[in-house]
Amino acid sequence: MKTRAVRIYGAQDLRLEEFELSLVGDDGVRCKVISDSLCMSSYKIYMQGAAHKRVPDDVATNPTIIGHEFCGVVDEVGKNWAHKFKVGDGFVIQPAHSYQGALTAPGYSFRECGGDATYVNIPWETLHMDCLLPYNSDVFFYGSLAEPMSCIIGTFHAMYHTRDGEYVHDMGIVDGGKMALLAGVGPMGLGTIDYALHCDRKPSLLVVTDIDDARLQRAASIYTVEHAKSCGVDLHYVNTGKLDNPIETLRALSGGDGYDDVICFAPVKQVVEQSDGILAVDGCLNFFAGPGDPAFTAPMNFYNVHYNRTHVAATSHGNTEDMREAITMMNAGLLNPAAMITHIGGLDCVVETTANLPKIPGGKKLIYTQIDLPLTAIADFAEKGKTDPMFAKLDEIVRACNGLWCAEAEKYLLSRML
């Protein structure tokens, strides 16, 4: 079977092309990809090529498919996996299979598996490590967002706290504690707000910062202070770009003691310093944003490390259980990560979009891999609808859903384009 996919050949060399997939055989599974959400990690692959830790050295001659936040349906099953999968089953991928400690992952390392493709053959490692997960929903974009949501969930689980005089680490955020999300209204920050408000272990105070008023206002319109209050959380949005002394102001918002849990969403020295500066005694700083620069450093107050037990954690991905939690919460209506999505497009726009990802404003770019469609901002549907009835209808649908991409919009788009 032929697939159409975006493959990387080296630094700044992505190509959309068609090629033949290997036969599935007895020990394989083939899947049809419906949706993939683009991640900044794919931009890092684009920039670094074979220098990226997850990308093989020989991609110039054996290119790999990019995209790791994907969802679709099982298309063919070898007899050795027939007990577990059947044709037509929905699936999502947990790319971080960690087989024997390896960094290889779909969307980075495999010639025949990645999200920006029409059809893929699932790697043996993914199957063996139980990372091809069942997805019992016909809303595909939620499945694509299960992977980024699992990264957020993993972050909450990776936070830890200590006990003075005891050699114990208590895992997770402080239940009923104080939490701050710095540079926290990008797509991953929005997902974090959603999870913080609706998970079973939540803060009593949540402060979210950024330096962009428009992004803060959008976040506040989706996750309102009033809704947070109904969840038992005192939510504040703060533009630190307008503050003379952000650390002082943020500490004052905490009541002067600082924050138990702080997540830093930007690999920017100033933001890291602010994150460190607002930690409470035994405060945990999670450096969520992976820097592209191997030499990136930022100061940390080691007086507070010694006397106040401040400490750092870092997470780059979730695990399979985190993804299962994300799927369960989405299916139960407890999470709605649609706020992360600001653009939609088809497979034909992936190369240009990935290459320019940092320059394109907004949040997640959602790709429907079975169609061709220029990258289009949800905010531009109304304008495009003046000449295109499809976009006029999509605009009507999303307006009824607080301006967010939704199941009805997805179903309408695919019914028109497939």
Question: Predicted regions span which residues?
Answer:
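C-terminal hydrophobic helical "lid"/dimerization subdomain
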Residues: 163, 244-249, 257, 270-277, ...
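ADP-ribose/adenylate-binding Rossmann-like module
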Residues: 261-268, 277-296
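NAD(P)H dinucleotide-binding glycine-rich loop of Rossmann-like/cofactor-binding domains
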Residues: 57, 97-177
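Adenosine-nucleotide cofactor-binding segment
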Residues: 176-177, 182, 193, 197-271
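Glycine-rich beta-strand-centered segment in the early N-terminal region that forms part
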Residues: 22-36, 51-100, 114
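Glycine-rich Rossmann-fold phosphate-binding loop(s) that bind the pyrophosphate
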Residues: 148, 184-186
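N-terminal Rossmann-fold NAD(P) dinucleotide-binding loop
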Residues: 189-190
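Rossmann-fold NAD(P)-binding glycine/threonine-rich loop
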Residues: 273, 289-309
